[in-house]
Amino acid sequence: MELIEQVSVAKKANIYFEGKVASRSVFFSDGSKKTLGVVLPGEYEFSTSQGEIMQVTSGSFEVLLPNSTTWQTFSEGSQFELAANVSFKIRNNAIAEYCCSYL
């Protein structure tokens, strides 16, 4: 199991899509932040307010990236990058997890 050490974690979860997507904010001493999330099966659309790197930590997602018409599969250990102020879609058939790093 990969660990993130010496951080502060928000007690309250970020809940989206009627509880089908949940994440926790993790704060580092240098001021940076990541979110660790769990996504139940479904299809969801998200928007970014800043650049992000999404790493799949468990399971897999199909992702429709901005300005694309083709869904791409990202499995455990893979990642994709998003610019600020864009929308993207993800879908999955089984529970999946992610770690989002903000740029």
UniProtKB/Swiss-Prot annotation:
Gene Ontology terms: cellular component: cytosol
- An example of a Pfam family matching this protein is Ppnp
If you read the UniProt record, what top EC class would you report for this enzyme, in one word?
transferase
Q: List the catalytic activities from the record.
A: a purine D-ribonucleoside + phosphate = a purine nucleobase + alpha-D-ribose 1-phosphate; adenosine + phosphate = alpha-D-ribose 1-phosphate + adenine; cytidine + phosphate = cytosine + alpha-D-ribose 1-phosphate; guanosine + phosphate = alpha-D-ribose 1-phosphate + guanine
Q: Which UniProt keywords apply?
A: Glycosyltransferase, Transferase
Q: Which InterPro entries match?
A: Ppnp, RmlC-like_jellyroll, RmlC_Cupin_sf
EC number(s): the record gives: 2.4.2.1, 2.4.2.2
Give GO terms: molecular function aspect only.
Answer: guanosine phosphorylase activity; purine-nucleoside phosphorylase activity; thymidine phosphorylase activity; uridine phosphorylase activity
The family classification in the record reads: Belongs to the nucleoside phosphorylase PpnP family.
Q: Note the HAMAP family from the entry.
A: Nucleos_phosphorylase_PpnP
Its recorded name reads Pyrimidine/purine nucleoside phosphorylase
Q: Which organism is it from?
A: Shewanella sp. (strain ANA-3)
Which taxonomic lineage does the organism of this UniProt entry have? Bacteria, Pseudomonadati, Pseudomonadota, Gammaproteobacteria, Alteromonadales
